[in-house]
Amino acid sequence: MARILLAEDDDNLRPFLARSLENAGHEVLAFSDGDEALPALHAAEFDILISDLVMPGMNGIELARHAREKAPDLPVIFITGFSAVAMEALNTVDGVSKVLSKPFHLNSLVEAVRNALEDRALS
């Protein structure tokens, strides 16, 4: 089981992702944007960050940078509807484990979480 910080501004997708990850055995704290997630990031330890790239206020790239300052080996998974933005994220943030383009299959996210956690355990 992993403790996951989820930041997603889509009010329909966020609870669906959180429930699905919880059903896969993970503990999920879900927030609507980076600004809302940042205090939780500083207050608690997480095993993985899953974040939308484009959100109001603090975007996913900025949130990931804050997360990596606190925990340099924290796996980061980005989800986005913009493939060009996804490529930019891969080039600007160290330690990105996966970028998933919306729409994606839930199994892809669960597998990305599992792979990121396994990679972290091996390093």
Mark where each language-model region is.
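Conserved acidic carboxylate
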Residues: 8
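Alpha4 helix (beta4-alpha4-beta5 surface) of REC/receiver domains from two-component response regulators
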Residues: 62, 82-100, 107, 111-114
